[in-house]
Amino acid sequence: TVEYNYNSNHLEGNTLTYGQTELLLLFGKVSGEGRLKDFNDMKASEVSVRMMREEAENRQQQLTQNFIRTLHRALLREDYTEYQTLPSGVQTSFVIHAGQYKTRPNSVITRYGDRFEYASPEETPALMSDLVDWYNEAERKGELTPVELAALFHYRYIRIHPFEDGNG
């Protein structure tokens, strides 16, 4: 899981080296320079990976929205405030709630400059319920390989983007 955590966290801007990541996750030690947040994020990522592995190994347990929210809470660790500058230059802030579905719309600018809007906050709980039901039924039927099931789940999940941050 060192390689997964290292690469996943670097996509989010984590500055730890591979060696620092390995030392932290395998031996619980810290070496060299690094932001405290980066070390904490890496440890939280490892906890989340372990939670997913344990959940996957427990074949008697179906996937639930509660597990997804608990996993998100473990990954983010705590609520925090996000600060942004709007195109008009106005400063704004809002709280990211760990383990809670989004309360604000979220979107991304595509490589073509278009804005892609994810599911609205109002739609999100029902869409997540549908997604979890679909996943559990698809797993029960066994018609998809684990890789196909994971890929389709991830695609549908990312299209919803249920949290304000930490959806990756």
How would you describe each model-predicted region?
Residues 1-167:
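FIC/Doc superfamily catalytic core
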